[in-house]
């Protein structure tokens, strides 16, 4: 009955975000090579049901807000075997110039790739 440690869900949110970037054709490595980073400024996680070490889980991600400087994602972790919602969450991140640490506007070449995926809350 080993319950999944609560911190793992935040790591899974990150993995889902990285995969989302990749799926829309934006590589975080390319962003970094262009001098940008995407730090997360705020994280929320509401735990609804426990998950266990042998559970197969699915992380569902939605991009719910997008400006050229900020992105907000909502998450839902579910156990597909019984359709149990394990947790929900939210992250807010901002585009930052890695050289200065200052908030910066995302170049249009990246921004236009994300816009079609913004969903209303």
Describe each PLM feature range:
Residues 1-40, 98-121:
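Hot-dog-fold acyl-thioester-processing enzymes
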Residues 5-6, 42, 49, 83:
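Histidine (H) residue identity feature
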Residues 7-8, 44, 72, 77:
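Compositionally biased, intrinsically disordered low-complexity segments enriched
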Residues 20-71:
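Hydrophobic beta-strand-centered segment that forms part of the acyl-chain substrate-binding groove
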Residues 52-53, 63-121:
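HotDog/MaoC-like acyl-thioester-processing domains
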């Amino acid at each position: 009955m080993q319950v999944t440690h609560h911190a793992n869900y935040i790591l899974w949110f990150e993995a889902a975000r990285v995969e989302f970037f990749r799926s829309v054709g934006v590589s975080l490595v390319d962003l970094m090579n262009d001098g940008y980073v995407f730090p997360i400024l705020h994280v929320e996680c509401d735990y609804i049901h426990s998950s266990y070490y042998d559970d197969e889980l699915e992380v569902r991600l939605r991009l719910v807000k997008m400006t050229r400087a900020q992105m907000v994602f909502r998450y839902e972790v579910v156990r597909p075997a019984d359709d149990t919602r394990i947790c929900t969450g939210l992250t807010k991140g901002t585009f930052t110039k890695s050289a200065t640490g200052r908030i910066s506007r995302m170049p249009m070449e990246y921004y236009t790739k994300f816009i079609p995926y913004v969903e209303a809350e």
